């Protein structure tokens, strides 16, 4: 990881104070997160998780409310133990594909359908021809009634890149273990459903994978104003709390293992749908990346550089170009969903994928990197803990905090644009 303390000190004089304030915001978010885990807790009925965490002496379960509470010391201990680097880490702005969109885009199809095995084979060949810009991948698209292990073996034909699977969808212990000890495979597991509610079957898979020694990517995707508060800071707190909970479980099982931070919060439209075309989607994920690069020091993978467009048209291409530029100009560690996905991750398109890859080559070829660290001007929210304490694992959409902050993400993106820090 870069020396971000040094980078802040070396930053342009007119950026320095804003960057110092931004780092203080991330430190406060991390502190608030530990308070959320200690006082609000995580909803769960998973006996293995409860037994595992209570055995540390730093967590306690309250059966009357069905929540487990973690002391800050357990989070500190887990972060201290966790790996901060991994084999194959290519550093900042490593982009890839992932998320397993449910449908393959086919022009003229009346009804959307997943891919066939033959189509997946073809897509993996296409990805293999673009590994100069696509440096990691999970399955590009769902296969109709596909066996996860068979899909993984198709992906395993690719060398010189990191492949990502989800062992939670595999049957049997051997299926989980087949990639154990391999540096070129990571296991992406979402063990917490936002907001702050343990998915017990997924946590069983996380524990099994940690015991097998797999490299983990701990993922969660809170929706601002729906399953998380409608402000950037409070939304990040929910995201951070969910990943820190999974981290505590994994590090208790297997101290020192790789646990990439995969918290990928999402902006939403007033109708509740995802909004991957919004500039704040990319800014929000840059902020989460910085929280980890600057404070926790965990390797991180974010989301962005995508689109809500439903077909691979000029708008879809422009959204991807703009989003990837925001991610890379401000700087992330890893980011997925960056190539070929449409309609807020519902579709994967070969046409869009090839256009996105070529556009990224042109960006890299023409980029003039002055090396300056640029502030995000992340807005603060002094009610972040209060709203999470009040709503906990219920619906944030009906809370007054959401109503009072409906324009928070629009205002943030406009403020950054007004400072000339977003693409024209």
Predicted regions and their residues:
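Glycine-rich, N-terminal phosphate-binding loop and its surrounding beta-alpha-beta segment
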Residues: 48-111
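Helix-rich catalytic cores of soluble enzyme domains
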Residues: 111-333
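Hydrophobic alpha-helical bundle architecture
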Residues: 285, 289-291, 295-394
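N-terminal small/glycine-rich loop or linker at the start of catalytic domains
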Residues: 25-29, 34, 91-110, 294-307
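Flexible, glycine/charged-enriched surface loops at secondary-structure junctions
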Residues: 43-50, 63-65, 254-261, 295-303, ...
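Catalytic-core signal marking the mid-to-C-terminal active-site face
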Residues: 2-10, 17-32, 40, 45-52, ...
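Short acidic (Asp/Glu) and glycine-rich catalytic loops that position anionic groups and cofactors
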Residues: 8-13, 54-61, 223, 265-269, ...
């Amino acid at each position: 990881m870069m020396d971000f303390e040094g980078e802040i000190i070396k930053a342009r004089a007119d950026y320095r104070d804003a960057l110092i304030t931004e780092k203080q915001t991330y430190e406060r978010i991390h502190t608030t997160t530990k308070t959320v885990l200690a006082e609000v807790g995580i909803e769960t009925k998973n006996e293995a998780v409860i037994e595992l965490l209570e055995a540390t002496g730093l967590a306690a379960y309250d059966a009357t409310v069905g929540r487990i509470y973690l002391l800050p010391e357990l989070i500190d201990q887990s972060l201290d133990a966790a790996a901060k680097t991994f084999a194959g880490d290519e550093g900042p702005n490593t982009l890839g594909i992932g998320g397993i969109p449910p449908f393959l885009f086919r022009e003229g199809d009346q009804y959307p359908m997943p891919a066939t095995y033959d189509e997946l084979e073809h897509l993996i060949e296409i990805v293999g021809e673009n590994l100069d810009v696509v440096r990691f991948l999970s399955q590009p698209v769902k296969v109709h009634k596909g066996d996860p292990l068979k899909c993984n073996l198709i992906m395993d034909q690719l060398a010189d890149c990191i492949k990502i699977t989800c062992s939670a969808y595999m049957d049997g212990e051997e299926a989980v273990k087949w990639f154990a000890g391999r540096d070129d495979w990571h296991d992406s597991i979402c063990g917490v459903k936002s907001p702050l509610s343990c998915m017990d079957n997924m946590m069983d898979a996380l524990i099994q994978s940690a015991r097998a020694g797999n490299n983990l990517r701990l993922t969660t995707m809170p929706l601002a104003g729906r399953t998380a508060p409608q402000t950037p800071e409070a939304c990040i707190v929910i995201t951070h709390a969910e990943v820190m909970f999974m981290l505590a479980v994994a590090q208790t099982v297997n101290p020192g293992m790789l646990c990439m931070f995969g918290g990928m919060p999402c902006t939403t439209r007033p109708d509740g749908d995802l909004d991957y075309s919004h500039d704040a989607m990319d800014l929000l994920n840059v902020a989460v990346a910085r929280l980890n690069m600057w404070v926790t020091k965990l390797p991180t993978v974010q989301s962005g550089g995508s689109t809500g467009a439903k077909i691979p048209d000029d708008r879809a291409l422009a959204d991807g170009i703009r989003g990837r530029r925001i991610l890379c100009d401000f700087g992330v560690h890893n980011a997925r969903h960056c190539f070929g996905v449409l309609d807020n991750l519902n579709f994967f398109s070969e046409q869009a994928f090839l256009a996105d890859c070529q556009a990224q080559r042109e960006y890299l070829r023409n980029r003039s990197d002055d090396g300056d660290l640029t502030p995000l001007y992340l807005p603060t929210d002094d009610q972040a803990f209060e709203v999470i304490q009040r709503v906990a694992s219920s619906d944030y959409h009906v809370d007054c905090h959401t109503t009072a902050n409906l324009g928070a993400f629009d205002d943030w993106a406009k403020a950054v644009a007004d400072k000339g820090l977003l693409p024209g």
